[in-house]
Amino acid sequence: MEHVHWWLAGLAFTLGMVLTSTLMVRPVEHQVLVKKSVRGSSAKSKPPTARKPAVKSGTKREESPTAKTKVATESAAEQIPVAGEPAAEPIPVAGEPAARIPVVPYAPYGPGSARAGADGSGPQGWLVKGRSDTRLYYTPEDPTYDPTVAQVWFQDEESAARAFFTPWRKSTRRT
């Protein structure tokens, strides 16, 4: 079994070529033009030829279509009849809105969250700081509250928990 049986490889190649060519080549369908037979007519019709119709030399000359078109002497704006324009009536506008709508800061982690400023400052009255890199939030009772620079501010601890932030504990610090 050391030698390749070359005759089997050749037979497989030949069989593959025969099957491929057999399946790829389809029988040719010849389409033949069938003429309608005219009963009782033995006269042969002439084959169609392309002929140019003869031009009679004595015919009258037609005018070009552009010669019949009239040129407008007035502008289009002058041709449109204008009815009397109604006088412009002023629209009443309220001077000041009845109630001021508070501006809500952009909430990156849902309602009750706000982005921190460049210096880490947040909205007034919001005491919960958050770090988006560690997903931890800090309350004023935590010992690391003051040195922590906030990336996100939360209105309360429930808002931070809804945003899937976890509270800071001594056990969460890596040592």
Curated annotation (Swiss-Prot):
Subcellular location: Cell membrane
Domain of life: Bacteria
Disruption phenotype: Upon operon disruption no reduction of serine uptake at pH 6.9, no visible effect on outer membrane permeability, however severe delays in ammonia secretion, medium pH neutralization and growth also occur at pH 5.5.
Induction comment: Part of the arfA-arfB-arfC operon. Maximal expression of ArfA requires the full operon.
Region (Disordered): 36-93
Keywords associated with the record: Cell membrane, Membrane, Transmembrane, Transmembrane helix
Gene Ontology cellular component list: peptidoglycan-based cell wall; plasma membrane
Membrane topology: Single-pass membrane protein
TM region(s), chain numbering: 4-26
Chief localisation class: membrane
Free-text function comment from the UniProt entry: Required for wild-type expression of ArfA and ammonia secretion, not however part of an ammonia transporter. Is highly immunogenic and may play a role in virulence.
Protein family (similarity comment): Belongs to the ArfC membrane protein family.
Other remarks on this protein: Expression in M.smegmatis leads to reduced survival capacity of human macrophage-like THP-1 cells and increase of the release of nitrogen monoxide (NO), and increase of the release of lactate dehydrogenase (LDH) and NO from mouse bone marrow macrophage line ANA-1 cells.
Name this protein carries in UniProt: Uncharacterized membrane protein ArfC
Organism the protein comes from: Mycobacterium tuberculosis (strain ATCC 25618 / H37Rv)
Source taxonomy: Bacteria, Bacillati, Actinomycetota, Actinomycetes, Mycobacteriales
Gene designation per UniProt: arfC
